[in-house]
Amino acid sequence: MAVFTPVNLEAMELQEEMSTADVVLLLSSVPERTSDLVYWLDEARLRYRHGPAFPTLGSLIAHLVVAAPKVDALLRHAHLDGQTSADVRAAIDPSHDQELTVPLQEALEDFARVRRRTVDLLHGWGKSEWDRVISDPRGGELTLLDACRLVVKHEMAHVAQIRNLNALLPEPRDLGPVPPVEINGQ
């Protein structure tokens, strides 16, 4: 019988890199997965904070929605304009301090629309585009494929975070009818 220690388990992890097809598939699935997890949330649940160190679901969704056009612009400028330097980390991970400024459904639709544009752009890329190197002031040099892999890993982590926070939302309680309030003895 084999004993699996943490060292053995680490050695068993897949070291396989995401292919371009994997990257495109995962990028295209994030808006739909996010929508599936949160479409039913009301405003109170979007603003519910599980604890002081936890973001609200609304702020996580806003984070993804705000990052999507930044990532799209970064990839478009690198591909179409030949830009060779970009702050990839700033595009992927803008501030977490935002809340949704538009209704949830509108934010999800905007996210899906922007992401469709990005995926349409990526579908036309050949090996030379994926292998194009850009310089990130915080991360050094990386290919556009590596930049997209970072985006996928970051966004999928947020999808898992949304799923987990969603599962921990308190169940609504029916407190019964509101008793009439007497004003001035009446």
Predicted feature locations:
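Alpha-helical packing segments of well-folded alpha/beta enzyme cores
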Residues: 23-26, 30-34, 67, 71, ...
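N-terminal first-folded block
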Residues: 31-33, 37, 41-45
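Short, contiguous pre-domain boundary segments
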Residues: 7-19, 94, 100
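Short, contiguous alpha-helical
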Residues: 2-13, 24-25, 45-91, 133-186
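Acidic/histidine-rich alpha-helical segments that form the ligand environment
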Residues: 27, 92-135, 146-151
